[in-house]
């Protein structure tokens, strides 16, 4: 997620330069750009619409006392008529050692879960937890440490005791191939299964060109993408996976939309049929080396996801809006019109 501003600026610039390097040197000129543009051609099928499996990331204000009952009522009205089923509410972050002082950082967690269950009984409230991680971030969480993984599991169980309907992890930036990340997913998933609730993750983007994650690390010392193989390994360990398909450094809306279409196709190929797959929508505005507001639009992401989905009848596919506190009425309208409204 974009909240990790301490590391994201430099890393985003370096990975953007890696993408430019790939566009210009290892492949024939503009081959990758042309490929992305071609992914954005054609018309989405009429069947590529919401299946009632969508989600939205919610900020920390919902659990720290800043929100009121009136805000919950307004949220229910905003979500009415959409395909949103899951709310990922920021209940962390976890401490670097995996612990969570829940009473201090999320004192209104129980109030929020109770309020949502009353106002929106068909929705699930998942606790969004995570932290920056080693080796990408100094002093981050060490997921290779078994003691840290134990504390992450204990913290997750404590959060569920506050009425949450699932755990949604966002550990960043996880390098492709990380065994510690897979291990913590295995451990926490075993716990959530005993509690009868889902384990969900926010996932890195997949390599838009084979081996690009290795190139990014070689050039900058930082990774951004996951190999398709590793994405599949993660997906097999969870109940739901949401691709953070934004902050791409792409300069044009057509290239960004093609990127989302490609990401959707790649993710569909390796996500088990029983696992929910969601594609992230950039419901925020910013201009920096990793994100062009004029290019990364909700409309382009929705159209790209629909093109990537094609005529698939997969029911457990959805879109996820990031993030409620930055989303404008125009963002919500683009989601509703592009994804929720019937063609014709």
Can you describe what each PLM-predicted range is?
Residues 1-28:
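N-terminal Sec-pathway targeting helices
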Residues 88, 168-170, 242, 320:
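Conserved beta-strand positions in the central sheet of alpha/beta enzyme cores
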Residues 174-178, 199-267, 290-307:
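Extracellular glycoside hydrolase catalytic/binding regions
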Residues 28-38, 85, 246-248, 269-344:
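Substrate-binding cleft of secreted/luminal carbohydrate-active enzymes
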Residues 84, 161-164, 238, 314-316:
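A structural motif
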Residues 31-54:
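Ser/Thr/Pro/Gly-rich low-complexity linker/stalk segments immediately outside membranes or between
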Residues 106-111, 193, 246-287:
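Glycoside hydrolase catalytic-domain groove-lining segments
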Residues 47-72, 78-81, 90-235:
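Chitinase-like catalytic core of GlcNAc-active glycosidases
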């Amino acid at each position: 997620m974009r909240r990790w501003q301490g590391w994201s600026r430099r890393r985003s610039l370096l990975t953007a330069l890696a993408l430019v390097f790939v566009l210009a040197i290892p492949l024939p000129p503009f081959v990758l750009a042309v490929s992305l543009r071609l992914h954005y051609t054609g018309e989405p099928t009429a069947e590529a619409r919401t299946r009632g499996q969508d989600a939205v990331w919610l900020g920390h204000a919902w659990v720290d006392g800043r929100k009121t009952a009136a805000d919950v009522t307004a949220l229910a009205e905003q979500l009415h008529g959409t395909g949103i089923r899951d709310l990922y509410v920021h209940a962390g972050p976890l401490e670097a050692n995996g612990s969570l002082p829940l009473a201090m950082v999320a004192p209104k967690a129980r109030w929020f879960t109770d309020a949502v269950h009353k106002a929106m009984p068909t929705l699930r409230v998942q606790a969004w937890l995570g932290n920056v991680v080693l080796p990408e971030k100094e002093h981050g969480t060490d997921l290779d440490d078994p003691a840290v993984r134990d504390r992450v599991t204990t913290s997750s169980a404590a959060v569920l005791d506050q009425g949450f309907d699932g755990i949604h992890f966002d550990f960043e930036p996880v390098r492709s191939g990380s065994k510690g990340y897979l291990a913590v997913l295995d451990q926490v998933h075993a716990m959530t299964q005993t509690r009868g609730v889902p384990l969900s993750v926010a996932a890195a983007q997949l390599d838009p060109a084979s081996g690009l994650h290795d190139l990014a690390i070689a050039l900058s010392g930082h990774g951004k993408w996951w190999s398709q193989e590793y994405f599949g390994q993660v997906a097999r360990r969870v109940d739901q996976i949401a691709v953070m398909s934004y902050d791409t450094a792409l300069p044009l809306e057509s290239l960004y939309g093609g990127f989302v279409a490609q990401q959707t196709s790649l993710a569909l190929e390796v996500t088990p049929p029983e696992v929910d797959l969601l594609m992230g929508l950039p419901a925020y505005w910013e201009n920096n080396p990793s994100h062009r507001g004029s290019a990364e639009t909700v409309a382009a992401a929705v159209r790209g996801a629909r093109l990537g989905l094609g005529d698939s009848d997969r029911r457990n596919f959805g879109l996820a809006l990031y993030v409620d506190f930055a989303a404008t009425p125009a963002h919500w309208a683009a989601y509703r019109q592009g994804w929720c409204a019937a063609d014709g």
